[in-house]
Every structure is written in C-alpha cells, then in structure tokens.
C-alpha cells in the first residue's frame, strides 16, 4: 500500500505576539484528501495556526511545508506560490460588493494565474454549480443571503485549485438556519477528496465528516485522533472539560 502523500507538514511551530506565545510547539501532518477538524476554546490558537499555514501570520520558530514547498517569508515569489496552493475561507465572506458573483469567483484566476476570460467564465459557472448557485452568476453579493455568500466564497477559493482548503469558523457569522447549506457543500468537498483543515464549533459536523479531530488548548495540541476517540474517549482533563461544557 502506498504511503499517503503529506500535503501540510508542521513541525515545532511557535508563534508569539510580542511576549505572548500563542502557539507553543505545534506538530501536525495532514495527508492528501484528509479532513482535519480543529476544536478548542476561543484563544487556544486555532485560527492563528490556520493563518500561519497560508502565510497571513509569521511564526518565529519551527517549519511549515505545504505541498512539498517550505514556507519562506523572505521570498516573495515563494509566498505567492504558497498562496496559490492554499485556499482560505473566513468567518466574514469578504466578497467584493462592486463585482457580480461570477466576477468574484473569476478574479483570482484572471489576475494571478492570467487565465483567459472565457476559461475563467466557464470555470466560475462550474464552481457555482458545485456549490448550488449556478443561477446566481450575474447577481450582486448584496442580493444573496449569508449562506449563499459563504458558498460563493467557497467557490472563489476553489477557483485557484488549491492543494488544501483552510476553513476558519466559516459558519459562525451565519444565522442558524443557514449553517446547514454551507456545511453540506463542505461535506461534498470532503467526499470528493479535498484536503481540508477546519476550525469549527460544529461538533456534530466534525464527528460526521472529519478523519481526525485536533483539540487545541492554550497554544498546544492536547489530543488528536479519529472523532470516535476524541469525542467518545477523551484522554485529558482539558478535553473532558471542554466537551462537558458543550452540553
């Protein structure tokens, strides 16, 4: 059996904001097609870890490799290449309000990959169809619900054909009735073999979709394992307390 290909490799990663160390030696390997759910209290370092993976935050110690390429802050070309391999979706949808839905999806491939306009248009239509919004190509973002806007943001991230997709609490800004439609799109991506690294408060979703769940506490990974182990047989007092507080 072939060894799974490692897409994200994080080793001994430390990140400080001034004197406050928020990531205290993170080690994590993510293989192609794996879905990782990162859970933990606010302030445990979850979002900061994701922002380190795509180069939005600079870490002070350790190494981080994405799709075989080390993250090199001093090398502008390497950072541009990294950001093409890493898609990221945030809590806020961050769509450009003056551009149509289709143009939002087409923007990065047109500007960054220099794709021809007809190719980008066709790709954008296909991606919007994937997220269930084929009929919204010419709509303006303001005409969409929050759930629809977040699905456009997913399509936009996929337009760069990333090796890994980072999702940072992508349902936390949504009304409860809109959460399901976004999670269904993410579940479909997981089924199709997309490599996903997700910070989430949706525990049932993590239990259902994730291959492994990472529990972070106070800047460290306290536990990592399959959902049935992390949720069903927590090993540390911190995870037990975190899970009991959810009920």
Regions found by a protein language model. Give the residues of each.
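ABC family nucleotide-binding domain
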Residues: 5-227
């Amino acid at each position: 059996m072939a060894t799974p290909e490692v897409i994200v490799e994080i080793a001994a990663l430390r990140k400080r904001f001034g004197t406050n160390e928020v990531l205290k030696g993170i080690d994590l390997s993510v293989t192609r097609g794996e879905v990782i759910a990162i859970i933990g209290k606010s302030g445990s370092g979850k979002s900061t870890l994701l922002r380190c993976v795509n180069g939005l935050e600079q870490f002070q110690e350790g190494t981080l490799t994405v799709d075989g390429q080390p993250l090199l802050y001093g090398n502008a070309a390497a950072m541009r290449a990294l950001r093409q391999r890493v898609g990221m979706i945030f809590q806020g949808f961050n769509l450009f309000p003056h551009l149509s839905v289709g143009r939002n999806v087409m923007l990065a491939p047109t500007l960054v990959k220099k794709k021809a306009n007809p190719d980008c248009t066709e790709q954008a239509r296909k991606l919007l169809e994937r997220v269930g919004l084929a009929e919204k190509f010419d709509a303006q973002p303001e005409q969409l619900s929050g759930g629809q806007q977040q699905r456009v943001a997913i399509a936009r991230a996929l337009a760069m054909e990333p090796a890994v997709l980072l999702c940072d609490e992508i349902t936390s800004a949504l009304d409860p009735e809109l959460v399901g439609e976004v999670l269904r799109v993410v579940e479909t991506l997981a089924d199709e073999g997309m490599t996903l690294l997700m910070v989430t408060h949706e525990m049932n979703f993590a239990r259902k979709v994730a291959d492994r769940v990472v529990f972070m506490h106070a800047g460290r990974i306290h536990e990592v394992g399959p959902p049935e182990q992390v949720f069903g047989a927590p090993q540390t007092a911190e995870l037990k307390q975190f899970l009991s507080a959810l009920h």
